[in-house]
Amino acid sequence: MAEVGLLPFARVALQVATQVLPPYRTRFSKHQFTQPQLLAVLCLMRYEDWTFREAETRLREHQELRAALKLREVPDYTTLYRFLRRLDDVTVERGLGETVRRLRRRRRRAVSVAIDGTGLSYNSVSTFFIRRLEQHADRSARHRHWLKWVIVVDVQQQILLAQRAHQGPGSDVRSLPGLLDVAARGAPIRLVLADAEFDSEPNHQHIRQRLGAKSIIPAKRRGIPQGTIRNQMFRAFPEKPYRQRAKIETIFSAIKRKLSSRAPGRSLSIQIRQALLLGLAYNLYRLRHPLIWKDVNRAINT
């Protein structure tokens, strides 16, 4: 559970949602709840790791929270679920872009970014319990699938610039160009840090030729790599600037400890949307706590 107040988060979530969604989907929509209100509630659910029923209960109990969201009535849990099913990934991406714009304000400096992925559980069962089950199960009963969440972050400001999610396990080497193109729309990029999973000559070329940035990606240890840039990485790897990549692990840790380590849902599409909303909720959380993260950055850099 997050440690900061619900009311400031709810207010900023509603402000951002209002910028990316019209009040109603069509002119025939019921004027009971606006789309920004429902999106703000979904972000609040990710922020507090609530279920749909828990969200309905908490809103019913918390009059000030309803006032912060400008709710005259409490949405039923089925209303929230139906809105989540209708919500598209483009809307969440626009919401993330709006948070980046607010977090960066008028900064124009180019940023160093890191890209990496992590696994999210789609249920409430702990990974410890799953591993214990695997110890007593045959090979066919092993837990093989999870949701993989890949993000691009500004390593200095520690905010999300782009994200995607898909069923894991699987390689994300081909997803790097698209993610970086989205990230570059929010902030100019000068340096890209990634681990060996994203190692490929086309990725290096995309970063250097298309984005005009420097790339640091370790070459996979399978003999002398092919490609000019990969060969340079193999023979003279820049260790010192690459250390900044560890900050993306700090962000993953903060999200899983303070917000949630789950992307709940019975269908893959719902799980993916829950993961993307988790990234949006994290940036909204950052909008409320810039000073805390300045202290974290200072501690890491010393």
Regions found by a protein language model. Name each.
Residues 30-31, 35, 47, 82, ...:
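Polybasic low-complexity intrinsically disordered regions
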Residues 68-87:
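Major-groove recognition helix of helix-turn-helix-like DNA-binding domains
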Residues 238-302:
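Basic, amphipathic alpha-helical segments enriched in Lys/Arg and hydrophobic/aromatic residues
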